[in-house]
């Protein structure tokens, strides 16, 4: 069994990242997390090298004229085209559509493993943030084999490309830093996985 999934810091970091990508920065789920990242205390508790985290921490605190809720709206809601859509099927489906074949494959996998996960609204389950929240839930419930499968089959095949584009087009220092923190953290997880990451073609 992959030991990193059994550590408390895996579930905590997955839940923190998942919430920050999934919920508005003003929501009760994320407002305390936003404030924590604007301070320096979080770095000592994040399971990455302090030297790697230092520039990320500095970027979190960089001022921007655009308000954080406005940036979140622009990046995750619209009304204009999202610069880096957070749903897996947009990257994995040839037509770049929501509810694509990869979403259906995720749903089938969830059914086969008896996993029920409530979404905020009628949206695809393959949202980057919701997949991280699901990974945290699986780890917290000692379902480490399913957590590995979720990461290797349904998240890692597209998450690196999503994060690269997200960072390049974030347009706000907080979300640019969040993308970099996610990229560093997920790279560490992937390096420690036992099962191989599925190789899938990307269409964006």
Question: Which sequence ranges carry the predicted segments?
Answer:
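Charged, alpha-helix-forming regions
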Residues: 1-204
């Amino acid at each position: 069994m992959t030991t990193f999934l059994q550590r408390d810091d895996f579930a905590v970091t997955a839940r923190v990242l998942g919430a920050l990508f999934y919920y508005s920065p003003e929501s009760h789920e994320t407002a305390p997390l936003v404030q924590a990242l604007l301070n320096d205390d979080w770095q000592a508790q994040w399971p990455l090298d302090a030297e790697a985290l230092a520039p990320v921490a500095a970027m979190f605190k960089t001022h921007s004229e655009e308000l954080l809720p406005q940036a979140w709206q622009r990046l995750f809601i619209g009304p204009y085209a999202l610069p880096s859509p957070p749903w897996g099927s947009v990257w994995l489906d040839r037509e770049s559509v929501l509810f694509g074949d990869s979403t259906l494959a995720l749903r089938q996998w969830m059914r086969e493993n008896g996993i029920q996960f409530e979404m905020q609204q009628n949206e695809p389950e393959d949202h980057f943030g919701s997949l991280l929240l699901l990974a945290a839930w699986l780890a917290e419930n000692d379902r480490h084999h399913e957590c590995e499968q979720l990461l290797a089959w349904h998240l890692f095949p597209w998450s690196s490309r999503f994060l690269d584009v997200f960072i390049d087009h974030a347009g706000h220092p907080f979300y640019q830093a969040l993308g970099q923190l996610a990229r560093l953290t997920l790279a560490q997880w992937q390096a420690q996985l036992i099962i191989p990451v599925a190789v899938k073609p990307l269409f964006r």
